[in-house]
Amino acid sequence: KLGALLHDIADSKFHEGNEEIGPLIAEKFLKSQNISQSDLEHVINIIKYVSFKNSFDNTVFESIELEIIKDADRLDAIGAIGIARCFNYGGFKNRLIYDPDISIVSHKNKTSYKNSTAPSFNHFYEKLLLLKDLMHTKTAKDLAEERHEFMIK
């Protein structure tokens, strides 16, 4: 439960790309709650590895809890809510909605993905339409299929 509640704490995309601030804040909070060291480490690993940007690294920590939280996080990123979130974030970052002169990129690594400043439209092809194939649980796969279909309509 703690991993689900804290997985987006101080999300790096709202902190100039700083991927350490979330785990540090969570660790401080968890220590104040006298959480066991093993549970603390497990929650911190969930926070560190839940993001899509870490899907380019095959050496990351995995657990059933992380898989479930990844699925839930990715389900939030697709479908009607995902479309709204995409354009909302694009507006927040002052990105173009569409530019025919900016090609869609198939990101091969975390750095390429994180450094992208592509228009919101490109994000559909660079991430959102890929998510249905990255689900772990049967329930998430079924829900992702429906939400994926909604996006391509």
Regions found by a protein language model. Give the residues of each.
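An active-site-proximal "capping" alpha-helix that borders the catalytic cofactor pocket
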Residues: N18-S32
